[in-house]
């Protein structure tokens, strides 16, 4: 750059700083790059698949899936992990369906959890914005986008048509709160439901509610599905769950993680530690026996997981070793790598 351009740029930067404040424009090389802070999801495999060890702070995240797929359970697990780290969390319960007893079983400190059950979608999003701007809340869950009913729809007759009203509400709200979320370094998670598009011949007929704005503003989008049942004898005690990362602005997308959700207990973390420990050589498996550093810890996965539960120092050490290996490794290392297909690209457009 010649001297005249340098002088012109310096004058422009000086004027911008005087008018808009210091830091309004800066060179990226002037400051050290810092890793994006993350909050664990409570699932080791999902944290690894996300690439940064959890969900990114200061960003919007969307979690969507069919009914009873584990959406609320996953978000309550995020709250439990955040509270363990001393964070303040809020739950905007637009569905009016939050069960404090169930949340407590998943490790949530319900006494410290901020809960709102708004009457309208406008009220829910205004409360969310005010909590973000307080700079005092670290995690906010909005459950769910489909339940953010515009005031005009609530006050109108049952059969009235309100085309695009909810989509416009979401678009306006997200424009308003996105910058505040970044400044407050707050993680905002929107839970969303799935609807079917009529007349789709090719590609996925599934779509999410609330228009397209959330798809653009979300830094991470998670598609969560129930893939099977966990049984003890004939009794169903949990569900096999698969989470696919269909959008990720902070790490490579299209990774996936599989884990179990046990009813009344939440994500089966110790089971994940056993599986990933064997896969990456931290645990030895001989027949049905599992060993750690030459010492047998249990016969069968269930007994070995119970050993880790009874000996949390060993479980924590194993989890730390797995995280250090997989989260500091090259981008090619994945929790559950999947080959990108046309269906994946269709999912990304949901």
Swiss-Prot record:
Start and end residues of each stretch annotated as Disordered: 329-350
SMART domains (UniProt xref): AAA
GO biological process, one term: DNA repair
Segments of skewed composition (Acidic residues): 341-350
InterPro entries the UniProt entry points to: AAA+_ATPase, DNA_recomb/repair_RecA, DNA_recomb/repair_RecA_CS, P-loop_NTPase, RecA-like_C, RecA-like_N, RecA_ATP-bd, RecA_C_sf
Keyword tags: ATP-binding, Cytoplasm, DNA damage, DNA recombination, DNA repair, DNA-binding, Nucleotide-binding, SOS response
Residues bound to ATP: 65-72
Annotated Gene Ontology cellular component terms: cytosol
A single GO molecular function term of this UniProt record: ATP hydrolysis activity
Intracellular or extracellular location(s): Cytoplasm
Xref: PANTHER family: MITOCHONDRIAL DNA REPAIR PROTEIN RECA HOMOLOG-RELATED, RECA
Protein purpose: Can catalyze the hydrolysis of ATP in the presence of single-stranded DNA, the ATP-dependent uptake of single-stranded DNA by duplex DNA, and the ATP-dependent hybridization of homologous single-stranded DNAs. It interacts with LexA causing its activation and leading to its autocatalytic cleavage.
Protein name as annotated: Protein RecA
Organism of provenance: Pseudomonas fluorescens (strain ATCC BAA-477 / NRRL B-23932 / Pf-5)
Taxonomy of the source species: Bacteria, Pseudomonadati, Pseudomonadota, Gammaproteobacteria, Pseudomonadales
Gene: recA
